[in-house]
Amino acid sequence: MNLNATLIGQLIAFALFTWFCVKFVWPPIIKAIEERQSSIANALASAEKAKQDQADSQAAVEQEILAAKEEAQKIIDLANKRRNDILEEVKTEAENLKATIIAQGHAEVEAERKRVQEELRVKVASLAIAGAEKIVGRTVDEAANNDIIDKLVAEL
């Protein structure tokens, strides 16, 4: 192999160029690459953290929705129970009122029956006395009439 000055010059130029690139060009390129790697890693970590935060938030929202549904169901159940209680109370009051009205009606009917019965006894007794007077043909005195009417009413 033949070494001449051109080859030595090229070797020196290549060595200087390599030293210059390693000393001045390579560090900024490496620094830019490392910054880019760091930026990408941070972005990926941030995205992963955001994804985890979103999943946590989604779980929290689902828990809140579930709790709200349970609370709404409790309110609905309470309202239904209250409605049933009110209906039962009204039904009981209506039954009591019905029983009271029926009892009152029976009492009124019974009182009216007794009054009519008593009135009828008095009329029957008066008619019996009148009939007896016509049959006998004479009038019994007033005191005797009242006595007879009272006895007849008591017997009827």
From Swiss-Prot:
Q: What does this protein do?
A: F(1)F(0) ATP synthase produces ATP from ADP in the presence of a proton or sodium gradient. F-type ATPases consist of two structural domains, F(1) containing the extramembraneous catalytic core and F(0) containing the membrane proton channel, linked together by a central stalk and a peripheral stalk. During catalysis, ATP synthesis in the catalytic domain of F(1) is coupled via a rotary mechanism of the central stalk subunits to proton translocation. Component of the F(0) channel, it forms part of the peripheral stalk, linking F(1) to F(0).
- Asked whether the keyword Membrane is assigned, the reply is yes
Q: Name one GO molecular function term.
A: proton-transporting ATP synthase activity, rotational mechanism
Report the transmembrane regions from the record.
7-29
Q: What protein is this chain from?
A: ATP synthase subunit b
Q: Provide the topology term for how it sits in the membrane.
A: Single-pass membrane protein
PANTHER family (UniProt xref): ATP SYNTHASE SUBUNIT B (PTHR33445:SF1), ATP SYNTHASE SUBUNIT B', CHLOROPLASTIC (PTHR33445)
Give its localization: Cell inner membrane
This chain's source organism reads Mannheimia succiniciproducens (strain KCTC 0769BP / MBEL55E)
Q: Name the UniProt key words of this record, in alphabetical order.
A: ATP synthesis, Cell inner membrane, Cell membrane, CF(0), Hydrogen ion transport, Ion transport, Membrane, Transmembrane, Transmembrane helix, Transport
Q: Which family does it belong to?
A: Belongs to the ATPase B chain family.
Known partners and oligomeric status: F-type ATPases have 2 components, F(1) - the catalytic core - and F(0) - the membrane proton channel. F(1) has five subunits: alpha(3), beta(3), gamma(1), delta(1), epsilon(1). F(0) has three main subunits: a(1), b(2) and c(10-14). The alpha and beta chains form an alternating ring which encloses part of the gamma chain. F(1) is attached to F(0) by a central stalk formed by the gamma and epsilon chains, while a peripheral stalk is formed by the delta and b chains.
Q: What is its main location?
A: membrane
Question: What cellular-component terms does GO give this entry?
Answer: plasma membrane; proton-transporting ATP synthase complex
